[in-house]
């Protein structure tokens, strides 16, 4: 009887759990038996591992081979366990165990000739290894830049199974940590490219200052998409912990770039209007993968032609908008992904959407039904609503509007003021502040609250609408450099909740 052991990581959502892999060689009919809740891809690893081991010049045990993955109750999915399985088999055939194998986590898929292929989810796996106190992790060489983002743990890159075997014996070394660029390239989109639309430009600035949700309505070609694409450029760069969190989500989704794996700027995600519920919030067979709402975490989720999106997909946005996370239950377990994003909706006023509203041929009932797909509870969560109109010839002037860098400076000052004010209460932006805190400890003056009381008495606002209006009023005050919102800021914030209102 011979026993070998290796270790790997199972990633569920953004959490990783250490998996112990044991290889037991006993007398009996030759065959490979894999136990421990493996999925189809892991079942196929028996053939990949056997071919890789033999093609690297090693013998395969002609006896009964049992491969056990523990804990047995945890579902194991994917090909990330290949090199750990191969190392356990090779260790079982050795007379003397490899000391390095007991202190190293192994991640990677094997090809038939022994090459190590890249896998998804390396960053959350390495973070889990560091959390549990493991001294070293070996990853595919193509994933080494991603693994090198985690400090405080020894990361190594391997290209072939033979190279890994030599390193375990202590005869050769493996590639070490790689230093990569720590910045994401700036977007070339500039706010100065947008012609006219001063009201909508100001709404985008307010949205950036307070992390508010925004809805733009208007005919085609007025600049709704251009404005939405320029919102991420106004937002501050991600902090170190935020960068790792966002990068981990994109790692699980398989969307990381090999050259600049660390995401330092807020992401911009724009799914197609025909996207399904699973594409928006996440899903898939086996363990659920992150959807658009999670990929937009700490960034902007832009839903163009939102009136064309299915009702079920729109209603699925309610939970992440309120909770800042999405929990996806599947047969193999529950995956939880963060989903705290800024939502930007864009819609035409009607199905025909002419450039001139006077040319519209839609009946009044058709118009109501078209935008009626956006439910009241969903719209109530949108703080800023702007009606955009087609430009006249006078809007084309030689002078450009303010650039992204100019507006970003004002946004940064407003965000810093908000962060200092809310830091003792555990918040950073105005959009995150709870309603009771706004209405009790940070309530504006009685005169400033007059427009809100009037709207509430007339049934134009819900209590949630009052809270969201106050949040926008605080953002307007921060942009103006004031210590508290006055009646002008409250009235302006209230006007942003009324479709067609002007600044």
Curated annotation (Swiss-Prot):
What cellular-component terms does GO give this entry?
plasma membrane
**Domain of life assignment:** Bacteria
According to the record, the segments passing through the membrane are none
The record's SUPFAM superfamilies line, in alphabetical order, gives:
P-loop containing nucleoside triphosphate hydrolases, Ribosomal protein S5 domain 2-like
What SMART domains does this protein's entry cite?
A: AAA (SM00382)
A single GO molecular function, which one?
ATP binding
**Of which family is this protein a member?**
Belongs to the Mg-chelatase subunits D/I family. ComM subfamily.
Misc. comment: Was identified as a high-confidence drug target.
Q: What is this protein called?
A: Uncharacterized protein Rv2897c
Q: Which organism is it from?
A: Mycobacterium tuberculosis (strain ATCC 25618 / H37Rv)
């Amino acid at each position: 009887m011979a026993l070998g052991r290796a270790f790997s990581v199972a990633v569920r959502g953004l959490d990783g759990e250490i998996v112990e892999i044991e290889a037991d060689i006993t007398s009996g009919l030759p065959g490979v038996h894999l136990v421990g809740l493996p999925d189809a891809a892991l079942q196929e690893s028996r053939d990949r591992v056997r071919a890789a081991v033999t093609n690297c010049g090693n013998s395969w045990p002609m006896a009964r081979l049992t491969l056990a993955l523990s804990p047995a109750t945890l579902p194991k999915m994917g090909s990330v366990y290949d090199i750990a399985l191969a190392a356990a088999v090779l260790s079982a055939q050795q007379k003397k165990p490899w000391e390095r194998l007991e202190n190293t986590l192994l991640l990677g898929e094997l090809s038939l000739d022994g090459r190590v292929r890249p896998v998804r989810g390396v960053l959350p796996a390495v973070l889990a290894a560091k959390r549990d106190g493991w001294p070293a992790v070996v990853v595919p060489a193509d994933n080494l830049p991603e693994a090198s983002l985690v400090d405080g743990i020894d990361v190594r890159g391997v290209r072939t199974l033979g190279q890994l075997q030599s390193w375990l014996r202590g005869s050769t070394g493996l590639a070490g940590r790689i230093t990569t660029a720590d910045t994401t390239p700036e977007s070339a989109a500039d706010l100065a490219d947008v012609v006219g639309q001063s009201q909508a430009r100001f709404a985008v600035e307010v949205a950036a200052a307070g992390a508010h949700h925004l809805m733009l309505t208007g005919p085609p070609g007025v600049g709704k998409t251009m404005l939405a694409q320029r919102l991420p450029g106004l937002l501050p760069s991600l902090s170190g912990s935020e960068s790792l969190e966002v990068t981990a989500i994109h790692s699980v989704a398989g969307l990381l770039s090999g050259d600049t794996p660390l995401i330092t700027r807020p992401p911009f995600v724009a799914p197609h209007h025909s996207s399904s519920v699973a594409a928006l919030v996440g899903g898939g067979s086996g363990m659920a993968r992150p959807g658009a709402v999670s990929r937009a975490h700490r960034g902007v989720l832009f839903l163009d032609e939102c009136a064309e999106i299915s009702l079920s997909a729109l209603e699925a946005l309610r939970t992440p908008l309120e909770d800042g996370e999405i929990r996806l239950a599947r047969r193999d377990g529950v995956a939880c992904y963060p989903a705290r994003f800024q939502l930007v909706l864009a819609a035409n006023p009607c199905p025909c959407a002419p450039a001139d509203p006077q040319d519209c041929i839609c009946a009044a009932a058709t118009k109501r039904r078209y935008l009626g797909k956006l439910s009241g509870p969903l719209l109530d969560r949108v703080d800023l609503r702007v009606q955009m109109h087609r430009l006249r010839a006078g809007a084309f002037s030689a002078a450009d509007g303010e650039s992204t860098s100019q507006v970003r400076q004002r946004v940064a000052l407003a965000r810093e003021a908000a962060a200092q004010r809310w830091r003792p209460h555990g918040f950073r932006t105005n959009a995150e502040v709870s309603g009771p805190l706004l209405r009790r400890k940070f309530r504006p003056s009685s005169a400033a609250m007059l427009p809100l009381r009037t709207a509430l008495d007339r049934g134009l606002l819900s209590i949630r609408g009052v809270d969201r209006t106050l949040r926008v009023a605080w953002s307007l005050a921060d942009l103006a450099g004031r210590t508290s919102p006055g009646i002008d800021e409250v009235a302006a914030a209230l006007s942003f909740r009324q479709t067609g209102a002007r600044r």
